[in-house]
């Protein structure tokens, strides 16, 4: 599987949430401070970023990590998962970075960041490009196998990922089709976030 570093595991607003007076948000315990969801995976042959939210710059400064990113797996187009894509600029020094997402998310990214996805980009923009993927269709980042899985975030269909055959990564899950459960069998590690509580 390699090494997975959780860069952020907070809610869409981060923790603490501005204006919240609950015990967690007013806590002085540093463990109660969480940046928005993102992870960095090192496999045998690839460095893969999973989601790239608005805290990405701070996450990478904290991680002291500046290396080639071979691909970014995007789960969905919500700002807390893509708001940091512009901060990939310095990483373009190594190579152009593929952004893997479903067609729906790719369309939203093209509309939000048109300056990145045109034939002739001007200097200084992130060196990123979109690669559309489909749930259930395997692709590779270098030699690392990636299987996108269908997940439901409320009524919004999003992607989870099975990476390298041994790691599952699913965020903002409300429901998941039976076929996605089947595709997760045999994992060593499953990282999941569910925003609803059943009790």
Regions found by a protein language model. Name each.
Residues 173:
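Anionic-ligand binding region
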């Amino acid at each position: 599987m390699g090494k997975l570093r959780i860069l952020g595991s907070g809610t869409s607003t981060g923790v603490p949430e501005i204006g919240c007076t609950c015990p967690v948000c007013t806590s002085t315990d540093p463990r109660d401070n969480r940046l928005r969801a993102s992870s960095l995976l090192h496999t045998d042959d690839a460095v893969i970023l999973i989601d790239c939210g608005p805290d990405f710059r701070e996450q990478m400064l904290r991680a002291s990590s500046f290396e080639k990113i071979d691909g970014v797996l995007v789960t969905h187009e919500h700002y807390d998962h893509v708001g940091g894509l512009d901060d990939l600029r310095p990483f373009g020094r190594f190579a152009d970075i593929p952004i893997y997402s479903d067609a729906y998310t790719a369309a939203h990214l093209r509309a939000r960041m048109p300056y990145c996805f045109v034939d002739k980009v001007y200097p200084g923009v992130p060196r990123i490009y979109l690669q559309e993927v489909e749930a259930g269709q395997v692709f590779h980042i270098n030699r690392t196998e990636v299987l996108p899985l269908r997940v439901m975030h409320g009524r919004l269909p999003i992607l989870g990922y099975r990476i390298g055959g041994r790691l599952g990564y699913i965020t903002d899950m409300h429901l998941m089709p039976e076929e996605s459960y089947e595709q997760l069998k045999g994992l060593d590690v499953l990282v999941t976030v569910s925003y609803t509580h059943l009790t």
